[in-house]
Amino acid sequence: MMHPTIDIKTFLKPGVRAHLAGIGGVSMCPLAEVLLGMGLIVQGSDMTESDTVCQLRAQGIDVAIGHSAENLKDCDLVIRTAAIHDENPEIAGAIARGIPVYERAQAWGAIMQHYENALCISGTHGKTTTTSMATHIFMAAQADPTVMIGGTLPMLHAGYRVGKGDTIILESCEYCNSFLNFFPTVAVILNVGEDHLDFFKDLKDIEHSFHAFADLVPQRGYVISNADDQGAREAVAGLSHPVFTFSLADRTADCYARDVAFFDGCASFDVMIHGQLYAHVDLHIPGKHNILNALAAASAAYVLGIPGQAVTRGLEDFHGAGRRFEHKGSYHGAAVYDDYAHHPAELHALLTTARSMGYERVICAFQPHTYT
């Protein structure tokens, strides 16, 4: 893998031509739109035609189908997805011509430095749901955020939005230490467990990665961590600045839930911060674990000055993200849900949630996915 010696930030200016290899990808399409909005000339390539490709072309972005060194034209830099390796003809062509090649995460890391607030939400589980919750809250507060989510959010009809506000919200993945390319002003750690063991050596290695991620936060920023999770506690131990904690019931935490009640599997509770009522929340997605996700999103909103009313309104309107216990309909009277859970801990939370909803029988069809 080639490591450019020129900081990608030097290219983020009007008139620079950027080629995005794999431009139709879930986080490459919004990247293209953000770069276009910054005044860059954006072009790219993808393997197939798609609605995303059509959407990019409608904005004046030249998208080639198929990968070829000829697609590079006279570009100044190349940005690629993780799925595109050095053997790809565009990457090989760029290297041969001395055109710097950057990873997608490097580009997002450079972009977030243009925002006053960079809210990066990490964790072994719950990232997509919590990032979606935070998006609803900041939208309710009319903060007009730029958002990058690893799934589809019905409110956006996509997994991203490009806003004009001073906040960017990103789902931040630890795989291959990707999130260490970021520059968070607020880093959220939901939980830390064994995952991606094709890359990490063991749990300690994973905890070290999350610690390094939290350590990226400047002194003026905030690290928000789950006080109920052992791995998260280990990850933030020894940080040079204070940690803002959230908990389901520990009243010594900065943020905790009070008066929790369940209705058809969905929780209703008060969000308490420093012993004071910040917001009341009525969730419309089931599961005890989603209380913690909501507390994490509320904590991030609080430290960034969002009023509690926006938390209440935003979560009132949140009905889940795509493939996160997503109700698809019914079959012969049985409710059918789709969920991306593929880690043992995620499966446990999923089945516990389903059983809490009063169904007489729960059947799970599971397709193994990813190394873990």
What residue ranges belong to the model's regions?
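N-terminal leader/targeting and accessory segments in enzymes
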Residues: 1-103, 107, 222, 256-258, ...
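Nucleotide phosphate-binding/pyrophosphate-handling subdomain across enzymes
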Residues: 3-19, 27, 31-38, 263-265, ...
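Phosphate-binding loop of NTP-binding sites
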Residues: 9, 34-37, 57, 71, ...
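Structural beta-sheet core signal
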Residues: 20, 44, 147, 187, ...
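Cofactor-binding loop segments of dinucleotide-utilizing enzymes, especially the Rossmann-like FAD-
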Residues: 23, 47, 124, 150, ...
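Hydrophobic beta-strand scaffold residues
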Residues: 42, 63, 98-101, 145, ...
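Beta-strand->loop->alpha-helix junctions that form or flank phosphate-binding loops
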Residues: 45-46, 64-67, 103-109, 148-149, ...
